[in-house]
From Swiss-Prot:
Swiss-Prot/TrEMBL keywords: ATP-binding, Cytoplasm, Nucleotide-binding, Nucleotidyltransferase, Transferase, tRNA processing
Domain of life: Bacteria
Subcellular location field: Cytoplasm
One Pfam family named in its UniProt record: Sua5_yciO_yrdC
Family: Belongs to the SUA5 family. TsaC subfamily.
Gene3D superfamilies listed in its UniProt record: DHBP synthase
YrdC-like domain sequence ranges: 3-185
GO-annotated cellular components: cytoplasm
Descriptive protein name: Threonylcarbamoyl-AMP synthase
UniProt key word DNA repair: no
Function summary: Required for the formation of a threonylcarbamoyl group on adenosine at position 37 (t(6)A37) in tRNAs that read codons beginning with adenine. Catalyzes the conversion of L-threonine, HCO(3)(-)/CO(2) and ATP to give threonylcarbamoyl-AMP (TC-AMP) as the acyladenylate intermediate, with the release of diphosphate.
Catalytic activity: L-threonine + hydrogencarbonate + ATP = L-threonylcarbamoyladenylate + diphosphate + H2O
Originating organism: Shewanella sediminis (strain HAW-EB3)
Length: 185
């Protein structure tokens, strides 16, 4: 496993790699959202069923537009989202037709977040698009909180580790349905 700086993982991700990186609250695992092979590998590493869906994190809202159907959200709904971004709020939004089921799972919606974490911002800016993001753990286990835990859980299974500080949040992001406004987590 290569320990990398955020600006050094672009090629790894573009070539289908899976990387670990700090987020607002825990370490995450991520890959290219347009590479089904990489997503399948990520799901296998986590032992996570594809039906649950995944989260996309982005450096700005524009990066999410190829994946979400903005036309199905009102200006009022979008404004409630924009007030919370960038930050530790993940919103469930309608998907564009043809989106990979590996991203949205068995749903017709997708969890998305514009992150304020500098590492995620840097990765997504380099990629020019969002990153698949899920907590760095095997399904049912607590998420990794340090580089040491990443190495213990995933050594030899991921392609790069970006070390860095976690954000100030004590728990993973709040998840809100963008249409109903209902808090789901």
């Amino acid at each position: 496993m290569l320990e990398q700086a955020p600006d050094e993982v672009q090629e790894i991700i573009e070539q289908g790699g899976v990387v670990a990186y700090p987020t607002e609250a825990v370490y995450g695992l991520g890959c290219d959202p347009d590479n089904d092979e990489a997503i399948t590998r990520l799901l296998a590493l986590k032992k996570r069923p594809w039906q649950k869906g995944l989260i996309l994190v982005a450096s700005d809202y524009q990066q999410l537009l190829p994946y979400i159907d903005e036309s199905r959200l009102t200006n009022e709904q979008l404004n409630k989202v924009f007030v919370k971004w960038p930050g530790p709020f993940t919103f469930i939004m309608p998907i564009k037709p043809g989106l990979s089921n590996l991203l949205c799972g068995s749903f017709n919606s997708l969890a998305v977040r514009v992150s304020s974490h500098p590492t995620i911002q840097a990765i997504c800016q380099r990629l020019g698009k969002p990153l698949v993001s899920t907590s760095a753990n095997h399904a049912g286990e607590p998420p990794a909180m340090s580089c040491e835990e990443i190495i213990a859980k995933f050594d030899g299974e991921i392609d790069a580790l970006i070390s860095g500080s976690l954000g100030a949040e004590r728990k993973p992001s709040t998840i809100v349905d963008a249409i109903s406004g209902k808090v789901l987590r």
